[in-house]
């Protein structure tokens, strides 16, 4: 969803209600065209997140820098402020110092503005142009790349600036590799979606292939690397490459895009957007409620995968390794939780009244 289509009214929210209240609400679904949605605030997405103390001041500075750099018109600038990306990063990286937090917010704004071009922007169905833009963006991470002219290529300049600040703290070779790899996978997944749009085969794909693309295009893996850097997490490569850690990464990424597909469904219907797992499952024969229930089942399955992975995580002889691995897994969970809370607070999909109803009753009224 582009910045223009991303936000409705700002949302305030209340604690979720389960048990009898939710069951009673489900029984009333027949009175209007509505869907009963999954319990989003469960498992690793449960609990109140911690906020970074630098959120307000740094968020303002990052927004102003971006607005001037890309020469935003007043309408787009207002939308950027409303988006409040600093809140998202605040929940994902609550322990980052001011400098690291600023880099994280700049990165987050870059990611969303850059993605605009391929979502609802001019390159949403132009594969060759999109490929060229993505290759040029990734090239800014090469140490032999010349300094980008901010006037000619403001988004490339933003990303190069973020990369230079990342490098300035001397990240480990493993973290640098993860940074580059996750960004490449993310941007290539976006390119794959552009190709599907261009060829009009968005929903004519295998379910597993669709899910693999979404878990990378959502950008969660890249944000894991941002938080790992911002929190100065120092887990050794042996631990980071363990299957249990990689399963937890996959779960946190999947829960992020599944939450988005649940909460965006009402808005996707209104805008005629088909890039949603609910639509794909309906295309494959499920009813609308059946498709939404399937999303819930996938979320529950992911939560079980997380629990199993934690149970199978080895205990390293070095206690510092165990501590750092735990910090990294907490960071992955925090990214998913941050996206969930930010999605409600920012009003990116549901306005205040709609958001309250979904949180209280798990009922989403449809257009």
Curated annotation (Swiss-Prot):
Q: Where does Mg(2+) 1 bind?
A: 115
List of residues binding Mg(2+) 2:
115
Note on how the cofactor is bound: Binds 3 Mg(2+) ions per subunit.
Binding residue positions for Mg(2+) 3: 260, 264
Output the Gene Ontology terms for molecular function: metal ion binding; terpene synthase activity
Which pathway, per its entry? Answer: Antibiotic biosynthesis
GO biological process terms on file: antibiotic biosynthetic process; isoprenoid biosynthetic process
Cofactor(s) the protein needs? Mg(2+)
Q: In which family does this protein belong, per the annotation?
A: Belongs to the terpene synthase family.
What the record says about its domains?
The Asp-Asp-Xaa-Xaa-Asp/Glu (DDXXD/E) motif is important for the catalytic activity, presumably through binding to Mg(2+).
What's the name of the protein? Answer: Cycloaraneosene synthase sdnA
Q: Give the gene name.
A: sdnA
